Amino acid sequence: MIEPILLGIVLGMVLVTLAGLFVAAYRQYQRGNKMGL
């Protein structure tokens, strides 16, 4: 049985990681568009 607190921490870390990757990809995409790619 998984500890609810541990499960919450893991889910939170996963969400933050996915959000960070999405933001980084979005910013890189915007920078590429501004350069005329």
From Swiss-Prot:
The keyword Membrane applies. Its main location: membrane. Coiled coil: none annotated. Pfam families: PetG. GO terms for molecular function: electron transporter, transferring electrons within cytochrome b6/f complex of photosystem II activity. Keywords: Electron transport, Membrane, Photosynthesis, Thylakoid, Transmembrane, Transmembrane helix, Transport. One of its GO terms (cellular component) is plasma membrane-derived thylakoid membrane. It is a single-pass membrane protein. It is found in: Cellular thylakoid membrane. GO terms for biological process: cytochrome complex assembly; photosynthesis. The 4 large subunits of the cytochrome b6-f complex are cytochrome b6, subunit IV (17 kDa polypeptide, PetD), cytochrome f and the Rieske protein, while the 4 small subunits are PetG, PetL, PetM and PetN. The complex functions as a dimer. Component of the cytochrome b6-f complex, which mediates electron transfer between photosystem II (PSII) and photosystem I (PSI), cyclic electron flow around PSI, and state transitions. PetG is required for either the stability or assembly of the cytochrome b6-f complex. HAMAP family: Cytb6_f_PetG. This is Cytochrome b6-f complex subunit 5.
